[in-house]
A protein has these predicted regions:
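Conserved SAM-binding loop and adjacent beta-strand
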Residues: 32-52
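N-terminal auxiliary segments of SAM/dcSAM-dependent transferases
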Residues: 1-24, 33-38
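Conserved SAM/SAH cofactor-binding pocket of Class I
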Residues: 45, 49-110
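Short glycine/serine/threonine-biased micro-segments
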Residues: 22, 32, 42, 64-68
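Short, isolated positions in well-ordered beta-strands
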Residues: 27-29
């Protein structure tokens, strides 16, 4: 059984769209088999985002280490207009994150 942090090229593609709202803004992310939380925005990520977005101090830059398909970096870039750098070991997740950056009209280095 593959883990999301492995680059398992034998997995069958099952592309899908994840839709969610944070801070009253809508997001759509491309997802696929072989990535973390491929079916939905996981509870931990939702709680993390809702918590950090309440902070008054907004960072001018951030590193999204283990970005997956990009929900944290994308939401934080849109909310904070911060310089965002995203990185992940999973090649499929990185390709999806690149697509999600473009489709959510944010700027990030990945």
């Amino acid at each position: 059984m593959s883990q999301y942090f492995e680059n398992d090229k034998t997995l069958q593609d099952k592309p899908q769209i994840l839709s969610f709202q944070i801070n009253g803004k809508s997001y759509r992310l491309h997802s696929n088999s072989g990535v973390f939380s491929k079916d939905k925005l996981d509870t931990g990520t939702r709680i993390l985002l809702e918590t950090v977005l309440k902070e008054e101090d907004r960072p001018s830059s951030m590193l999204d280490l283990g970005c997956g398909i990009g929900p944290v970096g994308i939401v934080c870039q849109r909310e904070w207009n911060a310089q965002v750098t995203m990185i992940d070991i999973n090649e499929k997740a990185v390709e999806l994150a690149k697509k999600n950056i473009v489709e959510n009209h944010v700027q990030a280095n990945i």
